[in-house]
Amino acid sequence: MPDRRLSQLLKSKLLRRSSTTATTSPKQNQKPVNAQKKAAVGADPLVDPNSTSDLSCSLPPHLLTSNEGEGDAKSRAYSIISSIPLDHPSSPDEIPGPATGSSAGCEQYFTHFDRSGANSRQEGSQNGSIQQSPTFTRTLRHKQLTEEKDKGKLQSREGDQRGEYGYQRIRNDSNDSDPQYSLTTELANKPSTPQTPAGDDSLHSPSATPLPLSPSLPGPTGASSLQAAYRPVRENSSVPLVESQLTPSLGAVAEDSSGESAFHFVGPSSSSPFPKRPPLGFRRQSLLPASHQHLISGLLGFGPSQNLGQGSGHPSTVNADMIPRKVWVKRPGGSATLVPTMEDSLVDELRDQVIMKYANSLGRTFDSPDIMIRISPREGSNRQSTPERILSPEEPLGVVLDTYFPGGQTVDEALVIDIPQRRTPKPSPRHPVYYHHSEPGEHGEYFPLMPANPNAPTPPTHPSASSTSVNAHHTGPSISILTTDSNMASCPQPPVAAPQVPTPPGPPPESPQTKTHTPPARVASPRPRPTKPKKAGNGQSPNAAFGGLIEGTVPPINVLIVEDNIINQKLLEAFMKRLSVRWKCAANGEEAVRKWREGGFHLVLMDIQLPVMNGLDATKEIRRLERLNGIGVFTKTASGRSSASSLSPEVNQASSEVSLSEEDTLHDLSLFKSPVIIVALTASSLQSDRHEALAAGCNDFLTKPVGFPWLEQKVTEWGCMQALIDFEGWRKWRGFADEPQSSSPTDGGFTSPLQAGANGVSSRTSTSPSSAAVNATARAFATGPGAGKRKSTVPELTKPVDILPEEPPGSGSGEGNETLDSPASPLTSVHVGDPTEPPGDEEQQALDAT
């Protein structure tokens, strides 16, 4: 029996080898078999020692016929492999030893898998050969012989088999239930399914599981090794896990060709002609099933029209009330415009849209609740059902429009936007602008600090008439005295117009001008006025010399500019040039004091922040020197005279050597007619800085930057004040110094030498009560008793009597030095003449002095 079976097996082996292409395992190394296997080989080394009697059972020929259908072939091939377990062992002698896994099982597995070689194998089976069971294995010797013979064929066929196997394995993993897969896919799926206990039982069945392992037993049979090798591949498609599963469970069979085939053949799937199914992330296109796709379309659509073509039959997800609607609106008398709203919007929401539409005209002034929407019915409609009215904010706009305008609203039927009639914010901004324009400008900042603030408007009236301009300049700076003069000047004008002059003896023609200034005891201010008529006759040439001035009102004053900034210094110099005014510059306070000591300055523009010595210190030093040298209104000596004016030049110098140091002495007092006017210039506008500057001795406080119009007015104002003080210098400048003086003094009156004019003949004689009063007052002081008492009570009237004889000719009048509480006119001293002289000589002497 065993011999017969061995011969049949050998014959079938030889027939199979001749009819089919031998496929061998890619493994080159195989562990040596045990001694039982070598003994079982016996004399015939070509016989497979692992074959058993139960494995050599003949299979019915109809199982391997080529005319079977493909489905039957697959099922029967699967049944062949699944029925491989050893069910019919004939005798113990026929089992030489436990079956060991080899490449035969894997080879037969690939034989069923290989579609290209399926026909050749089926032909071999039809010729009467018995197909070898997958559980047969080869010995190491037989394997080496086969590898030596078929080495060339192995290399060519090995790649094809691996590629096809890898492709089938990948497709099998991607979809296990696909009926299109081949028989080998089913073979790999069934035994390796981990969910069914049958798969596990097949692995451990008596037929598939080897006998108890011994050191000589290398591993399980071919079928079980195949299942054990491919099961981890199905469960985990990672190569390291395949090796870790094979190594501990199979021992020596860990290098079995089945496991290695799975390891090598999964890789080259990229070059497979079979397309790989896309992953799950790419196949999933929606979160909802196909039956709910209409929801996605409804959400993404803008209207119900887009959902009509889907054919799903589901209603649209967009409500008809959400459709936008446009309404015609307009302002009274304006053009209509469209405003977007919703179908279910209220009138209040329409007002919000109107504010956004009229962002400039309405949005800047009104809020949406402030406006009202008025609707007018359509022409020809029932006025009772649809009257013209103001829409309420809570009314639905769509319903109202459909009620008033069935069929749609036209442009002519636009809603009217009504706004409140009176808005207080509108006029309020205009008033500040109006008042701002009416402000006098920079003059308002400085004149309020002066007591003569009411006289500030008089400077603009200067250009009106030359005589009044000088008078106005007189009144502006003269503060207390000139304020009364100006008030009295306006009152006496009507009496002056009346020719009641015959009573006074010979009033000079100055009296008409004194009519404008008729101070009873202060006729000094009227005296300059008589010179104005001559200025009208001869003053054209001096005015031509100062072409840029306003009728020559700015006198030839000398200005000292104290500024450390070269740019500001040049600007002020340019202003002085335009005004035709002489000037000098100083870069610091010390230099300013040094130049002031030279004399001849009428105005000082003093910057506060200066190097070496600041402006306030320089101002204090100038005021100190003026006080020590008796310039201006200062304390009197024991005799009641001014410290500066009561002494002759010789006596003055002698006393200065005793009381004053050389540094504090001013050598030529004739150049200092009055205290110089100091104007503080600073970039600070703080009130504290203003007070500090005024306390230091400044006459005015001005803020930078300085404009030319302001500077021109200021120079005119302060220059005219100095012209009144230095009347002699101003008179020379006006051309009166060379006039012939014809005086015919009589007891009854005086003929003014200034009235002679250019012809040298008195043009007119006029008398005024003011001049008569002045003369009477002078005579009363001259001849009346109590001359000593007069000196004590009215000390200011006695000083000019002593000064006039001592004043050197041509040095200018020192009248400004005799004022006690205000800069009095230099002519005040004229009326208090020498009592020994006749009145005519006194008047003439006064005129000569001026």
From Swiss-Prot:
One protein family per Pfam: Response_reg
Does the entry feature the keyword Phosphoprotein, yes or no? yes
Recorded protein name is Response regulator sskA
Q: Does the keyword Lyase apply?
A: no
Comp. bias intervals (Pro residues): 492-511
- Output compositional bias ranges, type Basic and acidic residues: 144-163, 436-445
Which keywords does UniProt give here? Cytoplasm, Phosphoprotein, Stress response, Two-component regulatory system, Virulence
Q: Which organism is it from?
A: Aspergillus fumigatus (strain ATCC MYA-4609 / CBS 101355 / FGSC A1100 / Af293) (Neosartorya fumigata)
- Bias type Acidic residues, positions: 839-850
